[in-house]
A protein has these predicted regions:
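An alpha-helical appendage that flanks or caps ligand/catalytic pockets
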Residues: 1, 40-147
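Internal, glycine-rich beta/alpha segment that forms the wall or movable "lid"
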Residues: 1-27, 44
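Hydrophobic faces of well-ordered beta-strands that scaffold small-molecule active sites
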Residues: 11-14, 31-34, 62-69, 151-153
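Glycine-enriched alpha-helix->loop->beta-strand junction motifs that scaffold or abut catalytic
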Residues: 25-32, 147
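Glycine-rich, proline-tolerant flexible connector loops at the mouths of alpha/beta enzymes
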Residues: 37, 154-162
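C-terminal helical cap(s) of enzyme catalytic domains, especially alpha/beta-barrels
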Residues: 44-52, 160-175
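Bilobed periplasmic-binding protein-like "clamshell/Venus-flytrap" ligand-binding domains
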Residues: 145-156
Length: 175
């Protein structure tokens, strides 16, 4: 058996830099920007992709997906605490110490140094956490700014039930 045999799986370019945007535009392919971990060049990359896009056999006009870390909970406080898992995970990447997804903590400030906080906050700039109403507003702003056709969502939530609940709430927000 050959996975995907007989299907027409579209080719995408996933990038976190301007080069990926230029390549996707030149090849006339859909472009997914990895703003869920490298958001600094997102707006410029999306703009370059749209400006330089050349139609292809696969795609007649630009098609953009942006990535975002999104954690939705019933309360702002619960979402903030759940988000500390992502903050710890990215801090570990900065330190070069990977590991399993850590449980949330009450006091993230005691986990990282000011320099780590600054670096991680920059990496997580396209990350939203909050109640459904908060997330609805933040997503509307993101989608309006990027004019993205699709959204790729990452939810690094330690507790499985909380992760499922987050996606349930996000689905309600997206309706």
């Amino acid at each position: 058996a050959i996975p995907g045999e007989g299907t027409n799986v579209p080719l995408w370019i996933l990038g976190s830099s301007l080069y990926g945007a230029q390549l996707a535009a030149m090849l006339g392919l859909p472009y997914a920007f990895a703003s869920h971990f490298a958001p600094q060049a997102m707006m410029e990359a999306v703009s370059i992709y749209r400006e330089q896009f050349k139609p292809s056999a696969q795609l007649s006009q630009p098609y953009v997906m942006v990535g975002c870390n999104i954690i939705v909970a019933d309360t702002e406080d619960e979402a903030r605490k759940l988000f500390t898992t992502s903050q710890q995970q990215f801090t570990r990447m900065v330190r070069g110490t990977r590991g399993q997804l850590p449980p949330p903590v009450d006091d993230i400030e005691s986990f990282w140094s000011p320099i780590e906080k600054e670096r991680v906050s920059s990496m997580l700039a396209c990350s939203f956490y909050g109640s459904p109403s908060t997330i609805k507003g933040k997503l509307a702003t993101l989608m309006e700014a990027t004019k993205a056709d699709e959204l790729m969502v990452v939810a690094a939530i330690w507790d499985h039930q909380a992760r499922v609940r987050s996606f349930e709430l996000l689905a309600q927000v997206m309706d």
